[in-house]
Amino acid sequence: MELKDKVVAITGGASGLGEASTRHFVANGSKVMILDINDDNAKAICDELGDQNVKYVNTNIMEEQPVIDAMSKIEEEFGKLHVAINCAGTGYGARILGKEAPHLLDHFKFIIDLNLVGTFNVMRLAAQLMDKNEGEENGEKGVIINTASIAGYEGQIGQSAYTASKAGVIGMTLTAARDLARHSIRVNTIAPGIFDTPLMMSAPDKVRDPLLESTQFPHRFGQPAEFGMLAAHIVENPYLNGETIRLDSAMRMTPR
């Protein structure tokens, strides 16, 4: 699927990897709808890139109705949807047994709801809208790209909730691709390593240095633009389906 003139929905598209994806797809001729809750950042991006290229709808992906409304907004503004990229999510660090109490169950549920259930919520409703498309010359109607993490394979100490949520995204990738194959919609997942997002840039050296040491080649943190580049390649490569791709410079997470 070519990028030019395609309509792309990006959750978390106002910051970090999502913002990089927004910028990359707009630069390559796509129209983007940002689904986020960061009004200030999203509106600033729309002003910078042009309201004719990118629009924004405040969306809590953990709830059904806001995502239904967002899909209706996409159809109203652009008429159709070709690509959905799920970047919205967050992390949380806590050991199963802390010094004073066990891991808070509500915190575990929140991470699962946002990172896993939220991803599934957007995927199912985006697929419903994509299914209305006539399809490309090869019959393809849409592409869905979810975001996991290398923590979904080798989570560190204190990452039980985050690892479970991202392993869930990885686990449903092939099944989702098989489910949606009859609708001519592809599903793939990117599992990023450590990227130089604002959150990581603000971390103290004692956090950054061990992570940097684990990178191989290139021996550095990933740049958000590199995530956007891979997302674009997934869209453009019609035979790539049901795969989770690690984007991590051959990094493997250590226990801590």
Where are these regions (language model features)?
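Canonical Rossmann dinucleotide-binding motif of NAD(H)/NADP(H)-dependent dehydrogenases/reductases
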Residues: L3-M33
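Catalytic Tyr-X3-Lys loop
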Residues: T90, A101-N121, I145, V169
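Conserved mid-core segment of classical short-chain dehydrogenase/reductases
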Residues: G91-K109, Q128, K132-N138, G158-A161, ...
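Catalytic Tyr-x(3-8)-Lys segment
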Residues: D113, D205-E226
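Active-site helix of classical SDR
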Residues: M123, S165, T173
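Alpha-helical segment proximal to the catalytic Tyr-Lys
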Residues: Q128, A177-D179
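Residue(s) in the substrate-gating loop at a strand-loop-helix junction
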Residues: S149
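C-terminal substrate-recognition "lid" of short-chain dehydrogenase/reductases
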Residues: Q223-L247, R252
